[in-house]
Amino acid sequence: LRHTIPMTPEFTILGRGRAGRALAAAWGPRAGLLDHGARPDGLVILAVPDRAVAELAQAFLGRCVHLAGSLHLPGVPCAHPLTSFDGQARDWKGTPLAITGAVPDGLRRAFGDLGFAAFDLPAELKPLYHAAAVLTSGHAASLWLGAEALLRARGVALPGRGLLPLAEATLRNVAALGSAGRTGPFVRGDEATIARDAEALPEPWRDIFLTLGRSLD
């Protein structure tokens, strides 16, 4: 009989949230995955809620890296994958990985093996970086979900996939064309349509509509 020698993990991911599960699935035997109450040896990746990072980091000083894009903890390096995790291994080729502090070279390579593209992010720019990420991800989702809720409230039930195909097509166009991929009345300077659309919206959506529409003027 042929015996298989178990592979010793190169590092341990602490936290079984969506990020921890996704990275563990992608790295396979290279990474262990434990609940955040565990105290493993070796290099530890803190994949825990932001509010828990500072306290846990004290238990692994000098041998941990956290994933929180919003936090800078002096002496605790950060590797923040600029993506939205769902707990599954995905194709992350070309996804930025923001590095702040002395992330070990081996861990940089491990992220690179998954397709992430590392870049150095100064600590003082993390709040701006994180705000840009929230605008792109959380706020974009809020706009889409809010727009569908506005329609449902007036009895408009869109068939099929609702507004999602429009959102996907818009992202494809902007990815391919940059600012030239933008369309709509604000791009055309159609003030009559802008006024009618704004009048149809309740607050705060009316103000959001007008502010965002003119934000790139």
What does each model-identified segment do?
Residues 82-87, 91, 102-104, 179-187:
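Predominantly flavin-linked oxidoreductase catalytic cores and closely associated redox partners
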Residues 20-21, 25, 37-92:
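Rossmann-like NAD(P)(H) cofactor-binding subdomain of soluble oxidoreductases
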Residues 30-32, 63, 75, 117:
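Conserved beta-strand segments of alpha/beta enzyme cores
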